[in-house]
């Protein structure tokens, strides 16, 4: 209920229940935010700031509006609703759909994936551990009626951990000649995606159900997602998952560094690892293919080059960055 009608409905229900039935009508009360316009003003026909939810549903879908309201339903604050917000969460639905298309394109089998194989590939261990951690967070937040935090947990894991990182990292394996690793990636990527649909179903039931039935996850195609039990995943976080975190950290820092210097994110660079510690140097050498692909690196050098370089610090290690010859470092710094 909204706080503005607590006395008119909630309080009276409690009074009537205790007076006539000698018991409270309910144990828990969830007081949600009021939905206002993007400036925080109360919606009014006279002000002309009323947003018709039916128009938003028609334009962006019921799931997009539903997920928007859930994500913004923080305790103690009103929802400042705008069309751009709903549009942003519609893009999230598109991201989910595109992830499904990626699995189809890479010939993933949607049947018989209730169990995952023994994990040998590091990125598979990492995403499975992230899934376990996210599941625990969502369960805790739902139990605490923090629907906004639960929605954000699901959003962050799906968009960033799974789509932005895991699927991108998996491409280096899917395009390799290692058939065993490719098969493991196919099975794990499909298994995790299946669990993502289960996690997201309370928030966006229509699109998740559509994908579930389309892929026939239950082997028959007639068992609805809404009938499935909640998932239980045990974390397997170890040194191998830490290695993946290290890769992500290095690539993220490289991208941020380019952005800070106003350099095109698509530009290629050379980096020198001459000044970093021995363990990190060995780690980078063993993960050179992935780092080059996602970091857009031409060469990873053991020695410094005799030309101007920008310096970047990652976890205490000093990297020297060499840009294309047409990039003027003096102009960048200005």
Predicted regions mapped to residue ranges:
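Short alpha-helical scaffolding segments that buttress acidic/His motifs in well-ordered protein cores
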Residues: 6, 14, 29, 64-72, ...
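Metal-dependent nuclease catalytic cores in nucleic-acid-processing enzymes
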Residues: 6-22, 251-258
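Catalytic cores of enzymes that engage adenine nucleotides and/or redox cofactors via long glycine-rich
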Residues: 21-39
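Catalytic adenosine-cofactor/nucleotide-binding cores of aminoacyl-tRNA synthetases and other
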Residues: 35-39, 43-118, 217-221, 260-269, ...
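Acidic, turn-prone loop/beta-hairpin segments
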Residues: 37, 70, 110-136, 168-252
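C-terminal low-complexity, glycine/proline- and small-hydrophobic-enriched intrinsically disordered tails
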Residues: 87, 214-334
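Core structural elements
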Residues: 91-104, 122-134, 152-172, 312-317
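Short helix-adjacent coil turns
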Residues: 142-149
